[in-house]
């Protein structure tokens, strides 16, 4: 399976990027993993949050393919425990999903067109996180899920 994390705008906080790099490297042991960054929009002055979401949506949708299984990281999505999330990944693999794409939107979230294209929504917490921090939290949880699936000692119950 190929897993891609599609994010809007680069991670500009160095310690967050370092953490992402650590877990992305570890993930390569288990799965083909790629982090794809959609460059930040230019000239957003005066644009409403809805206009920004629509512009970002066009960029997100352009990078998705028909065979992709699209999962939004969204505050209104289904919450999983770490073990539950590993089970979710196992179900995707058992179903023969080849390309699993997780999407982190910009600061204002997603436009309706992105919601319409998605197959699932997952929430990392009922709390709201900075969209850059979500990247690190998610990549770590992805790594944790694969260690659970491989019965490795990283995760403690």
Regions found by a protein language model. Give the residues of each.
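N-terminal beta1-alpha1 ligand-phosphate binding loop
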Residues: 1-27
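Proline/glycine-rich low-complexity loops and linkers
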Residues: 105-106, 117
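Loop/turn-to-beta-strand initiation segments
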Residues: 2, 98-102
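Structured adenosyl-cofactor binding patch, chiefly the S-adenosyl-L-methionine
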Residues: 112-156
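Conserved RecA-like P-loop NTPase ATPase core
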Residues: 5, 71, 105, 138
């Amino acid at each position: 399976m190929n897993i891609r994390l599609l994010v809007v705008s680069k991670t500009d906080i160095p310690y967050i990027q370092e953490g992402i790099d650590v877990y992305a490297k570890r993930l390569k042991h288990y799965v083909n993993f790629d982090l794809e960054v959609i460059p930040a929009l230019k000239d957003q002055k005066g644009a409403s949050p809805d206009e920004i979401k629509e512009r970002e949506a066009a960029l997100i949708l352009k990078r998705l393919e028909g065979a992709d299984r699209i999962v939004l990281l969204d505050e209104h999505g289904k919450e999983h425990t770490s073990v539950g999330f590993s089970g979710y990944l196992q179900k995707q693999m058992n179903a023969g999903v080849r390309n699993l794409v997780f999407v982190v939107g910009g600061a204002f979230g997603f436009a309706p067109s992105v919601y319409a294209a998605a197959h699932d929504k997952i929430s990392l917490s009922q709390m709201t996180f900075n969209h850059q921090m979500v990247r690190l939290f998610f990549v770590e949880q992805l790594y944790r899920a694969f260690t659970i699936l491989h019965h490795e000692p990283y995760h403690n119950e």
